[in-house]
From Swiss-Prot:
It comes from Sorangium cellulosum (strain So ce56). It is an enzyme of class 4 (lyase). One of its GO terms (biological process) is D-glucuronate catabolic process. It comes from the Bacteria. This is Mannonate dehydratase. It catalyses: D-mannonate = 2-dehydro-3-deoxy-D-gluconate + H2O. Keywords: Iron, Lyase, Manganese. Pfam families: UxuA (PF03786). Its cofactor is Fe(2+); Mn(2+). GO terms for molecular function: ferrous iron binding; manganese ion binding; mannonate dehydratase activity. The keyword Ribonucleoprotein does not apply. The gene is uxuA.
Length: 357
């Protein structure tokens, strides 16, 4: 298990040199964030990013994310040129030493929250999702959501939502299949594993189709193009926001198939109606048994990449919601502790945290 940490580049309030000081850190997960969606990332930019990361003694082997243009999801004629560009991005990432590319196929909205700074009883601030509040939102009036690279202007949002009114879940699956049949052969050719991130939260929102929500969706995904290069970013927090999703079972099934090149390990406190907030990583803080999840990774012989996911804002830290240093660092060290204990107390090879650099 290679423990990584997301970094948003030189504009990130969290310094790369600080991340390097986290015990057990292997590498950085990052991307080129200032190139418009659908355009090609210059290979020189990727190589420079790799050199910057390696300069502090870490690895850069996972990209998160290469955004998928809406015209691809909508199946519009422009998709062929955009898929060509996406394929070139896969090649360019491979040329810079990238092994895994995370991406998603969520229409319009990326990960969706109603609060960016919910105060918990201990005084920490966290991301939260109120199912009832979302049901009352009219997205056509214009909203800004965390996790976007940019937000739509109200008129742009209305236009793209109108386009999706005629796109059913099955039609979105057809568009995804077309996309996968184009990109997976390229990934195979250059030795990159694609890792689809599930929908977050794992349910339809604002009347938009969502197709990567549960076990059946994940199985359809990996069988659509049956290749080791067609994998999953198994995000415990995203899938875990639906109490029907058994994360331990998902890790055992898809990890046993060798289809989890990348995992997000975080906890989430979920209510029956789908309302949730993002808790500390510790099992007792949320709805997920993180120790059992880590053991499942161990039992399937997982040797891929994981990272702690969204953290709370603690100890007065400010910055990008969900992506501060302190709580994610605590999460990483906790996860490494679970991994070491699991390896030493379970049959199999002794625990080993991969060395950086």
């Amino acid at each position: 298990m290679k423990m990584t940490f997301r970094w948003y580049g030189e504009n990130d309030p969290v310094k790369l040199e600080y991340i390097r000081q986290i015990p057990g850190i292997y590498g950085i997960v990052s991307a080129i964030y200032d190139v418009p969606v659908g355009e090609v990332w210059p290979v020189e930019r990727l190589q420079a990013l790799r050199a910057r990361v390696e300069g502090v003694g870490l690895r850069f082997e996972v990209v998160e994310s290469v955004p998928v243009h809406e015209d691809i999801k909508l199946g519009k004629p422009a998709r062929e040129r955009l898929i060509d560009n996406f394929c070139q991005n896969i090649r360019n990432c491979a040329a810079a030493g990238v092994k895994v590319i995370c991406y998603n196929f969520m229409p319009v909205f990326d990960w969706t929250r109603t609060e960016m700074a919910r105060e918990l009883p201990d005084g920490s601030l966290t991301l939260a999702f109120d199912a009832a509040a979302v049901a009352e939102i009219d997205p056509e009036q214009g909203i800004s959501l965390p996790g976007w690279d940019s937000s739509y202007r109200p008129e742009q949002l209305r236009a793209v939502l109108d386009e999706y009114k005629n796109v059913s879940e099955e039609a979105l699956w057809e568009h995804l299949e077309h996309f996968l049949r184009r990109i997976i052969p390229v990934a195979e050719e250059v030795g990159v594993r694609m890792a689809m991130h599930p929908d977050d939260p794992p349910r339809p929102i604002f009347g938009l189709p969502r197709i990567v929500k549960n076990r059946d969706d994940l199985m359809r995904l990996v069988k659509t193009v049956d290749s080791p290069a067609n994998g999953i970013t198994l995000c415990s927090g995203s899938l875990g926001a639906d109490l029907c999703n058994n994360i331990v079972s998902l890790v055992r099934e898809f990890g046993g198939m060798g289809r989890i090149p990348f995992g997000h390990l975080r906890n989430v406190a979920v209510q029956e109606d789908g309302t949730f907030f993002e808790s500390a990583h510790l099992s007792c803080e949320g709805s997920l048994d993180m120790a059992a999840i880590v053991k499942a990774y161990h039992d399937v012989g997982f040797d891929g990449y994981v990272r702690p996911d969204h953290g709370r804002m603690i100890w007065g830290e400010t910055g990008k919601p969900g992506y501060g240093l302190y709580d994610r660092a605590l999460g990483l060290v906790y996860l490494n502790g679970l991994w070491e204990a699991t390896c030493k107390l379970s049959p199999g090879p002794a625990a080993k945290v991969p060395a950086p650099g």
